[in-house]
Amino acid sequence: MVLEQVAFDIETTGFNVDDEVTTVGFAVPMGVRVFVQTGERDAPGIESAVESEVSETLVRVSAHASESELLAAVSEFVAERIRDDMLLVAYNGERWNGGFDVPFLRTRYAQRDLAWPFVDVPYADVMPLVTDRFNTTVDGTEQGDLVTAYDVLCDGSYGDLDPFDDSAEAVAAFEDGRFAELVLHNVADVLRTRALGRVAERYCSKSEFKVKSLTPTRSI
């Protein structure tokens, strides 16, 4: 049985241990589900602003006042929607020697003393598949980042959704309260990740996905 992929991606206020998660997005079979925190600021109309820019994909957005509320909402979503016949995938989310999204989330859940949501959830990282099993060399230089890999292997239009030239701009967008732009960037990234995951499904064996469990050793 081939597990149905659910791509996810996060945005943060930075890379330090005390930085926070600002956005979590999932590309589910019916569309994209995004959770964004506003830092206690009013943020009306985010979903409608995003919908006006994304015509071919159903996007649902919920705004949360704080990181704690965002993480709690993500946990509820995972419990209700992510089943054991689905495969959670990310791009540089967590690899054997590093990664970003999963370690960052794990740290924030631990610091908030919240239960880890990804129980009985299989996970695979798309980045090693792309960089090890495909040629992503451009102009003589290997380019393993998400944007370039998507452009090289998928040649699709999801990049047109992204208002940022660099992911670092997501930090400034949160600080400035440009939440619709932040969400659009996240939507573009989860859709690019999903597209690369599907390419890997077409051309790589199941064993090369190196699926692992995210279930913790203890539940309490």
Predicted ranges, named:
Residues 1-4, 211-220:
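Terminal disorder- and signal-encoded targeting elements
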Residues 37-41, 208-216:
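Short alpha-helical "patches" and their helix-cap loops
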Residues 29, 87-210:
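Metal-dependent phosphoesterase core characteristic of DEDDh/y 3'-5' exonuclease domains
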Residues 2-108:
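Conserved non-catalytic scaffold segment of RNase H-like nuclease domains
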Residues 39-49, 123-130, 219-220:
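Low-complexity, flexible helical/coil segments
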Residues 1-17, 113-128:
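Short, charged N-terminal helix-start/capping segments
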